[in-house]
Amino acid sequence: MAVTCSTEISAVASGNSGAVIGRCANSADMKLYSLSILYKGATGARLLKGAYDVSSFSFFQRSSVQDFMTFTSQLFVERSENGSRATMKEQDYLCHLYIRNDSLAGVVIADSEYPARVCFTLLDKVLDDFSKQVDSVDWPSGNQNSIHYTGLDAYLARYQNPREADPMTKVQAELDETKVILHNTMESLLERGEKLDDLVAKSEVLGNNSKAFYKTARKQNSCCEIM
């Protein structure tokens, strides 16, 4: 499931580790796959709202793709510090993260061709809008059912074409890219001795079908490096 910024997840989405999901450098073909708002608590990250575009994936894989998007977004937030911006690269996909000092966080999962500057501007705008509409007292215990915020789908659709979204970035100060923490792979988020397989197995976000797809993809990927 490449959209979740993980080699294993890429394999899940394609159905086999040798498949490559094609994409073009044309801006019209750049893609945003998910936009999530989370709260970074003392014991983990809570998904408050999420919007997804999995239309480019096989119909039968879409549920698992979306599950792994959520899993990856939560892990990224949990392993990052408040007040930070970070980008995680895996294959041809990028996860962009911004955690405010008040523990409200946003994650965008995008095609690698999509401009990072636009992604971070989107996160700034979304978190600002969300914080104005949803009282902060509801964040620590909130979830997708209890939080009433309907703006994410519109943001995800509007920003699919970065050229249309780009004029809005002029409202924002230029982002100092030197302050963005870069992670080469999802594995770099793990602590010493920690295994992604174990996190997947213990995850409450992933359903049994998604975990089964992950295991199958891992087995296939162990003997094939074409991704």
Positions of PLM-derived features:
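Acidic, low-complexity cytosolic segments
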Residues: 2-10, 14-197, 201-227
